[in-house]
C-alpha cells in the first residue's frame, strides 16, 4: 500500500473542501488516514485459501454453523463503512476448518473496498473451493453508512444478502435447517 500517495490525496481533499490543512486538528490527519487504511484494507494482501488450507479430518459430515461473526468493511462506491454480522453454515466433505478460520475468511473479504453482495458470494465460494465443502450457506446482515449519512439518509436500515452453494442450494430441507440454526 502506498501510504505516501494516500497522505497526499487526503491533504488535497482537506484543501479541496475548504479547510486549512495546517490547522492543529488536521495537521496529522493525512498520516492518520493512511495508517487507518492499512488496517481497514489489510485483506488486500491475503487469501482465504491460506486460512482454510489447514483443516481437520472428521468421521461424519454434519452441518457446521458459526453465527454472529461481526465484521466491518468499506463500501467501494462511497468509501464509507458498512458493518454487521455474518452467519455461515457448511456441510463438510470429510474435513472441517478451525472455527477461527471461518472468522478469518470473513475478514479477508471484508477488509478491502467491497460491496455486500460480493462479500457474501466470496465467503460461500471460498468454503466450496478451499475447504471442499459439500454445501455452503452465507447470510450477511449489515448497516451501510452510505445509506445512513448521505443520499436517502435512513439510519438503522439493514441489508440482508445470502449465497447458497452445493447441497445447501439444492436440498430445501437442509437449507431450511441451516436457516433455522442461524436463527432465521
Curated annotation (Swiss-Prot):
Q: Which UniProt keywords apply?
A: GTP-binding, Hydrolase, Metal-binding, Nucleotide-binding, One-carbon metabolism, Zinc
| EC numbers on record | 3.5.4.16
InterPro entries given for it? GTP-CH-I_C/QueF, GTP-CH-I_N, GTP_CycHdrlase_I, GTP_CycHdrlase_I_CS, GTP_CycHdrlase_I_dom
Q: Which GO terms describe its cellular component?
A: cytoplasm
Q: Which GO terms describe its biological process?
A: one-carbon metabolic process; tetrahydrobiopterin biosynthetic process; tetrahydrofolate biosynthetic process
Q: Which pathway is this protein engaged in?
A: Cofactor biosynthesis; 7,8-dihydroneopterin triphosphate biosynthesis; 7,8-dihydroneopterin triphosphate from GTP: step 1/1
Alphabetized GO MF terms: GTP binding; GTP cyclohydrolase I activity; zinc ion binding
Q: Which reaction does it catalyse?
A: GTP + H2O = 7,8-dihydroneopterin 3'-triphosphate + formate + H(+)
Q: Where does Zn(2+) bind?
A: 75, 78, 146
Oligomeric state and interaction partners are given as: Toroid-shaped homodecamer, composed of two pentamers of five dimers.
| Family to which this protein belongs | Belongs to the GTP cyclohydrolase I family.
Protein name (database record): GTP cyclohydrolase 1
Amino acid at each position: 500500500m502506498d501510504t505516501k500517495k494516500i497522505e497526499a490525496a487526503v491533504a488535497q481533499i482537506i484543501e479541496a473542501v475548504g479547510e486549512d490543512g495546517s490547522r492543529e486538528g488536521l495537521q496529522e490527519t493525512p498520516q492518520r488516514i493512511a495508517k487507518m487504511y492499512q488496517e481497514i484494507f489489510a485483506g488486500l494482501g491475503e487469501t482465504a485459501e491460506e486460512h482454510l488450507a489447514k483443516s481437520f479430518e472428521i468421521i461424519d459430515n454434519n452441518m457446521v454453523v458459526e453465527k454472529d461473526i461481526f465484521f466491518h468493511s468499506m463500501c467501494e462506491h462511497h468509501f464509507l463503512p458498512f458493518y454487521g454480522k455474518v452467519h455461515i453454515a457448511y456441510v463438510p466433505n470429510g474435513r472441517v476448518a478451525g472455527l477461527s478460520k471461518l472468522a478469518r475468511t470473513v475478514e479477508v473479504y471484508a477488509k478491502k473496498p467491497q460491496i455486500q453482495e460480493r462479500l457474501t458470494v466470496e465467503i460461500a465460494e471460498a468454503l466450496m473451493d478451499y475447504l471442499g465443502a459439500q454445501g455452503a450457506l452465507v447470510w450477511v446482515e449489515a448497516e451501510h453508512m452510505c445509506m445512513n449519512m448521505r443520499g436517502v439518509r435512513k439510519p438503522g436500515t439493514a441489508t440482508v444478502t445470502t449465497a447458497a452453494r452445493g447441497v445447501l442450494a439444492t436440498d430445501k430441507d437442509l437449507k431450511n435447517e441451516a436457516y433455522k440454526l442461524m436463527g432465521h
